[in-house]
């Protein structure tokens, strides 16, 4: 995807796909950097917002993860995963505070 980004750096989906690959490789901060670019190009990219939530969970930035999922849910209210993930993150926070 790097080559595609070089050819068209304004194509948000290329950045999003590379962010996904980086996430799967465990390169969470690099993935976050690409997600930031996606959202700079297309602030309503709900897939990138959901991905940002996953990255923030891995980085243990739980409040940021919840905010990402809330934004995704606001943009795409019928998408079920943000609601589920928000609930799971809140439960995780609760368990860690015990």
Task: Label each residue range with its predicted role.
Residues 4, 37-38, 71-72:
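Canonical positions in the second alpha-helix
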Residues 24, 58, 88-95:
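Register position in tetratricopeptide repeats
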């Amino acid at each position: 995807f790097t080559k595609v980004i070089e050819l068209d750096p304004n194509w948000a989906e290329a950045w999003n796909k590379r962010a996904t690959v980086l996430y799967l490789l465990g390169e969470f901060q690099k993935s976050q950097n690409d997600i930031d670019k996606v959202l700079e190009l297309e602030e309503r990219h709900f897939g990138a917002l959901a991905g940002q939530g996953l990255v923030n969970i891995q980085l243990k930035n739980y409040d940021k993860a919840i905010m990402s999922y809330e934004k995704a849910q606001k943009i795409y209210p019928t998408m079920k995963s943000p609601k589920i993930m928000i609930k799971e993150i809140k439960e995780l926070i609760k368990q860690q505070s015990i």
